[in-house]
Amino acid sequence: MNVPWENAHGGALYCLIRGDEFSAWHRLLFQRPGCAESVLACRHFLDGSPVARCSYPEEYHPCVISRIALLCDSVGWTADVERISAWLNGLDRETYELVFAAIEVLEEEGPALGCPLVDTVRGSRHKNMKELRPGSQGRSEVRILFAFDPARQAIMLAAGNKAGRWTQWYDEKIKAADEMFAEHLAQFEDTKPKRRKRKKG
């Protein structure tokens, strides 16, 4: 994860982190032993960009970048299965276990996970739309369309068995997944801190 650094002076380092990364980084930092005392203050700039002021000694400044970047990279990914919960509840036990085994791997690996478990979807208007391909029972071909959002969540959007309906299945599911993810992103933007306009002095 690329963490842009602003400046350092007076024995403290100031780091500027994008809003979608800040909450996860801030939460992780305070959960790590020995890190709580390193953070003196956290606040938001007027434009909504969060800044963290860290009290690492001056001599550690060259190391802080890699240390904080490592903390950011170690923040886990999570899967949001709310939109496919009805489908999940209708699965037989073996298929259910195979699906959740695949989801657990996805949460561990994040966007780095590739074939054969994850593949890119063609025809979606979202460049990061992918499909999860868990193991299947018999002749079934289970697929789950998902996309990662800025909050490090894999949003599970549409799922089903595409066996025997290869092209038709994608035509139907991708369209639905596109709409759901667009709606999710819009809601995500609405919850972000609004940029304040500076008053003319």
Curated annotation (Swiss-Prot):
Keywords tagged on the record: Toxin-antitoxin system
InterPro entries: HigB-like
Induction info: Induced in persister cells in response to D-cycloserine.
Top-rank lineage group of the source organism: Bacteria
Cystines in this chain: none
One Pfam family hit: Gp49
Presence of the UniProt keyword Repressor in the record: no
Function: Putative toxic component of a type II toxin-antitoxin (TA) system. Its cognate antitoxin would be HigA2.
UniProt family annotation: Belongs to the mycobacterial HigB family.
Protein name as it appears in the record: Putative toxin HigB2
